[in-house]
Curated annotation (Swiss-Prot):
HAMAP family: PanB. Its main location: cytoplasm. This is 3-methyl-2-oxobutanoate hydroxymethyltransferase. 3-methyl-2-oxobutanoate binds at D44, S45, D83, K112. It is an enzyme of class 2 (transferase). GO terms for cellular component: cytoplasm.
Length: 259
């Protein structure tokens, strides 16, 4: 059995072992991923993947807690990070109340929230109260409506300031999204905590992908940075089509599958 990660072992992976992170929203897939990856992210992307919404903004804290518990049940030895959904960390008081609720009602190891140096004081408050925090800079999905879409972030100086401010505030790692590889590499070198990339090139300390993207289940849209390791949608459609065909023609269930 693989040794369970902690905040300290994640931090110690900086400049040594590439960290592998993947999303999961249920016990079934979490159990499959647990022995392979370093971290599982219960991302607010579930609002799009699981609930079929157009963005992440309407995900609720109740919804996130429900899925976090499913993931923790399926992967009890995994290092699990939970996204704090939009609107749950508007100020320090609300952020702390909601983060404490997450820790009380789930077994997740850490929370993740979006934002740069403007969130540093808030993050510091969480960390001082025993909450492990993963930062998220660059392209911020929770800001997609206000920014007019998903756009690559090019301001290197701002990203460096953001990363350093989050590190000083106490994050144990940072996700950097939608950033040119050379910029992400500079940010990674500038801080002592692991930087996990998504659409940010290969010079970060690790990578994270949405499981349904990398396994080819999400057919509506494929981001440029996603490599599909499986055409899951095609395989599922073929299998269900074969099942439907056998039911229609009366060949299933055969004697082999009957009591």
């Amino acid at each position: 059995m693989k040794k369970r990660h902690t905040v300290n072992t994640i931090k110690s992976a900086k400049n040594s072992n590439k960290l592998v992170m993947i999303t999961a929203y249920d016990a079934l897939f979490a159990k499959l991923f647990e022995p392979i990856v370093d971290m599982i992210l219960v991302g607010d992307s579930l609002n799009m993947v699981f609930a079929g919404r157009s963005d992440t903004l309407s995900a609720t804290l109740d919804q996130m807690i429900y899925h976090a518990n499913a993931v923790c049940s399926g992967a009890p030895s995994a290092f699990v990070v939970l996204d704090m959904p939009y609107g749950t960390y508007i100020n320090e008081k609300e952020a702390l109340q909601n983060a404490i609720r997450i820790y009380k009602e789930t077994d997740v190891d850490a929370v993740k929230l979006e934002g740069g140096k403007e969130k540093a004081d808030l993050i510091k408050t969480l960390c001082q109260n025993g909450i492990a925090v993963m930062g998220h800079i660059g392209l911020l999905p929770q800001h997609v409506r206000g920014q007019g879409g998903y756009k690559v972030v090019r301001e290197a100086d701002r990203l460096m300031e953001d990363a350093k401010a989050l590190e000083e505030a106490g994050v144990f790692s940072i996700i950097i999204e939608g950033v040119k590889p050379e910029v992400a590499a500079k940010v990674t070198d500038a801080v002592q905590v692991p930087v996990i990339g998504i659409g940010a090139g290969k010079e970060t300390d690790g990578q994270v992908l949405v499981w349904s993207d990398m396994l080819g289940f999400f057919e509506d849209f494929k981001p440029k940075f996603v490599k599909q390791y499986l055409n899951g949608a095609k395989l599922v459609k073929e299998a269900v089509s074969q099942y439907a065909k056998e039911v229609k023609e009366g060949s299933f269930p055969s004697q082999e599958f009957s009591y």
